[in-house]
């Protein structure tokens, strides 16, 4: 997959900008003001993603559900046996968030995971591997 940070890293390595997350990044991809190449992404529905992943034999782990206020959906998917795990360990989870996610894993026999906050070195707020 090609992400904005990958594009910017290549431009930075070529000497075409002085930082991965600098003025050029804001000009191209910024939210306020809107970047010149940023467009509204059309995401598939949750049901479509689940069906595609399951058809491919994937293990479905819901990453950082508390960050995006997705706990009602996580509770539903866990109860229905649709997901296989929940990311419990995440830098932005409060102790209460961790406790609720861990309890759901225990209740429904789900995998207890962590580590999706590591996005490599090209991130505004880098987190070490495993966070």
Where are these regions (language model features)?
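Charged catalytic cores and adjacent phosphate/nucleic-acid-binding surfaces used
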Residues: 50-51, 55-59, 66-131
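Extended substrate/RNA-proximal surfaces in nucleic-acid metabolism proteins
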Residues: 1-76
């Amino acid at each position: 997959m090609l992400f904005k940070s990958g594009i910017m890293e290549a431009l930075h390595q070529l000497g075409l900008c002085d930082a991965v997350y600098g003025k050029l990044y804001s000009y191209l991809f910024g939210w306020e003001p809107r970047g010149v190449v940023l467009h509204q992404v059309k995401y598939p529905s949750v049901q479509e993603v689940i069906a595609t992943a399951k058809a491919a034999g994937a293990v479905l782990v819901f990453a950082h559900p508390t960050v995006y206020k997705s706990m009602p959906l996580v509770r539903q998917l866990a109860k229905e046996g649709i997901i296989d795990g929940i990311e419990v360990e995440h830098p932005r989870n409060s102790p209460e968030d961790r406790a609720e996610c861990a309890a759901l894993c225990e209740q429904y026999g789900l995998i207890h995971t962590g580590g999706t906050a590591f996005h490599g070195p090209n991130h505004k707020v880098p987190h070490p591997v495993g966070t």
